[in-house]
Amino acid sequence: MKFYFIRHAPTYANKSGIMVNGYENADIDIHDKPEDWEERVGQYIPEEARRVIISSPTRRCLSTSKMLFGRYPDEVTEALGEFDCKNLGNRKFWEISEEEFNSLVYLPSSTMAKRANEILTDVGNLIKKEHNTDSVVAISHGMIIRYLYHYITGHPDVSAYDIINSKGYAFSNLDLLVADVNPGVCNLVFSYHYSKPMERK
């Protein structure tokens, strides 16, 4: 199965660079598709892969599907949902220490690895069986996709603190990560960046 992972379009919180309470309900403007997204990123997603779209259940991911592809996802799965970091409240996570982060967010690498395996194996097999396809567009979140990158490239023990701070791999809104997953083997194909990562101030 070849996955085309896309991070959702930016919400007001992404644009402001802060975490906010109730972010799980944040939405985007479905009429605000960047004119150059297809040229810079979308061109790397073949028509066959666009036939089936899966997504996190959050509004911003559902709306990103509608914005980019003109329709809502064919399937919605909690496996693509965001890791739970709500206890951070409105803190700027790059301004807090790793110790403080870990006191607020319990997210060991084993938990993230379990989720990655669920996406790449269980969800992939289900989509292949139900839709008779070998490729799928998957719309998800920054932390999930950044962790998948590390997992696929042989670094499953990376910390949640490093993931949320984009250490070792930055992945911004509307970026694309392509991963080719075969039985027992995950291969990173490439990542295509729509925009530069936000500068932290």
Identify the role of each PLM range.
Residues K2-E75:
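Active-site-proximal alpha-helix that buttresses catalytic centers in soluble enzyme cores
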Residues K2-I6, I54, H131-I144:
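Beta-strand elements within well-structured catalytic alpha/beta cores of enzymes
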Residues M67, Y147-Y151:
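Active-site signature of alpha/beta-hydrolase-fold catalytic machinery across serine-
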